[in-house]
Amino acid sequence: MQPPPRKVKPAQEVKLRFLEQLSILQTWQQREADLLEDIRSYSKQRAAIEREYGQALQKLAGPFLKREGHRSGEMDSRGRTVFGAWRCLLDATVAGGQTRLQASDRYRDLAGGTGRSAKEQVLRKGTENLQRAQAEVLQSVRELSRSRKLYGQRERVWALAQEKAADVQARLNRSDHGIFHSRTSLQKLSTKLSAQSAQYSQQLQAARNEYLLNLVATNAHLDHYYQEELPALLKALVSELSEHLRDPLTSLSHTELEAAEVILEHAHRGEQTTSQVSWEQDLKLFLQEPGVFSPTPPQQFQPAGTDQVCVLEWGAEGVAGKSGLEKEVQRLTSRAARDYKIQNHGHRVLQRLEQRRQQASEREAPSIEQRLQEVRESIRRAQVSQVKGAARLALLQGAGLDVERWLKPAMTQAQDEVEQERRLSEARLSQRDLSPTAEDAELSDFEECEETGELFEEPAPQALATRALPCPAHVVFRYQAGREDELTITEGEWLEVIEEGDADEWVKARNQHGEVGFVPERYLNFPDLSLPESSQDSDNPCGAEPTAFLAQALYSYTGQSAEELSFPEGALIRLLPRAQDGVDDGFWRGEFGGRVGVFPSLLVEELLGPPGPPELSDPEQMLPSPSPPSFSPPAPTSVLDGPPAPVLPGDKALDFPGFLDMMAPRLRPMRPPPPPPAKAPDPGHPDPLT
């Protein structure tokens, strides 16, 4: 009689399977590295003997054809693989035998391409990613083993307590209390043992529930590893190999076609074979050969001892098991909403970084690539967490818990936030806001979202029209500065907007005195540069209301007489029109700081165009008094407050929404929004803002 098979721990079995996978993968990569090295060696020797004819080429191709890996019959059975393409090229070399002097340089360049070191670097990178994913799976299996061990211990303690309680009860029923115990003491002992048995039963129930939850989570993780992560990693390795093998093989084929007319048929066949190489088919055949990359059987629940319960139990009213499972549902639904937001935000950050990488210099490329890897790793962790959480929630729902009660609000809130970000993205893209600052803020938001699972709530700002900076602006509402970096403005004043603010609804501007600060954007009116506005000038000695234009001082100037203006560098000067038939003597007339005078025109730069004759101005025309902007400050929120309970649309299904292309940059506001004006200003009776 043969002994029963030895029992192997689940963690040890999974670990051995992973080690075997790594070993076979390294062997496969080594064969491909040898093939790449063969191609480089072939090109180097071909460049040296290209000037010779006939037998030299045959002697060159002979050693490569005699290699064990290339002369075996597996080349024909594997079909359209890189090995078959390589064999076809060698046959074309043997059949040809003609040389071309101009092909020598091309072979020499091909020999200096990427070699074994680059292939080993690709293998090392892919192996690290695979080992990281395998370590996470092993951790899940170890957690399952620990919970199963605890479950077995609790079951043994509970069974022992049951036996003791049953023994005392039997003695009590037989009145067999002996000489050392009375009936009263036996009754007390029976009561005590019954209480202990009930307590151990609750502990057994909690341990069994934890075991079941870890069981479904581990199975889901294993399935995700074999269905998603492992094929993705292997596909990445194959794509890297294709970049190193496709170009050399294609170059060899083209060189043969151009070098000799007599071997045109053989060279053309080699080119077709190379272009028809199916990397997906090669990968599929490789996965079918070893047999170790097939998914492992799912883990099954193994009851301990005499316990035959294999489902979640959440007990009656008042039992600790009920509150524990409900808390578990709340935690899992919150985690599901967080994973959903992390994945959507992560894909948006990936798109931004990909655009930035295409335009980045060689010095910035490594840092951007590192950021891309970090974001991809965060998205992958969120996907794994989502798969495990979905399995747990499905089991909890099957046990009778109302999962929809917490899941729908959580997912609805997450989708609302994603929709808000999509609208913000459309507003940003309409302004072509693709600056590195916006991308850095996007990445910072993603990192904070990954750590806390919370996104800052802010109202979607109104999309602003694209305008070139700096540009002039007319103040239509007064504003008193509330911070040191803000600027106090008065109604009717002209400003120069020099840059966007550090938050929405704020811009940085410079007044006529050269002072710079942040002002509310909705308190300003940006005139059309092609249609200059007209304004009143109370200091005009002629009594007419000329059309006002702006000019910015390029240099500071001190007036040489009482008629001349003095102004600092950067000041905004309002130009007054000259006579229609006047001669430009190099001095313009303008107003600055409440004074009217002349100044050299070479010291300023026009902002609104040349001043026109007096007949073009309308004395009755003035800037209209606009109505207050439709704005209501957002309700105060705190980043410490968690997001409201999300909602999942749909019926009773527990599937999560797909990841949409909602690419929306979000800039975290650094200052509160400006207060709204109470009403439109009255030119005759100005009131302060409230």
UniProtKB/Swiss-Prot annotation:
GO cellular component, one term: cell projection
Subunit description: Homodimer. Interacts (via F-BAR domain) with SNX9 (via SH3 domain). Interacts (via F-BAR domain) with SNX18 and SNX33. Interacts (via SH3 domain 1) with WASL. Interacts (via SH3 domain 2) with ITSN1.
CDD domains to which the protein is assigned, alphabetical: F-BAR_FCHSD1, SH3_FCHSD1_2, SH3_FCHSD_1
UniProt comment concerning the protein's domains: The F-BAR domain has an atypical, flat shape and binds preferentially to flat membranes. Upon heterologous expression, the isolated F-BAR domain is localized at the cell membrane, and causes the formation of cellular protrusions.
PROSITE patterns per the UniProt record, alphabetical: F_BAR (PS51741), SH3 (PS50002)
Designated name of the protein: F-BAR and double SH3 domains protein 1
Keyword presence, Repeat: yes
Compartment list: Cytoplasm; Perikaryon; Cell projection; Cytoplasmic vesicle
Entry-annotated residues carrying Phosphoserine: S444
Coiled-coil portions: 116-149, 354-384
Occurrences of domain F-BAR (ranges): 12-282
InterPro entries named among the record's database cross-references: AH/BAR_dom_sf (IPR027267), F_BAR (IPR031160), FCH_dom (IPR001060), FCHSD_SH3_1 (IPR035460), SH3-like_dom_sf (IPR036028), SH3_domain (IPR001452)
Source species: Homo sapiens
Assigned keywords, A-Z: Cell projection, Coiled coil, Cytoplasm, Cytoplasmic vesicle, Lipid-binding, Phosphoprotein, Repeat, SH3 domain
Annotated ranges, domain SH3: 468-529, 546-609
Function noted in UniProt: Promotes actin polymerization mediated by SNX9 and WASL.
Biological process terms in GO annotation: apoptotic process; gene expression; import into nucleus; inflammatory response; membrane organization; neuromuscular synaptic transmission; positive regulation of actin filament polymerization; regulation of actin filament polymerization
Ranges of Basic and acidic residues composition bias in the record: 422-431
Compositionally skewed regions (Pro residues) per UniProt: 625-636, 670-680
Highest taxon in the source lineage: Eukaryota
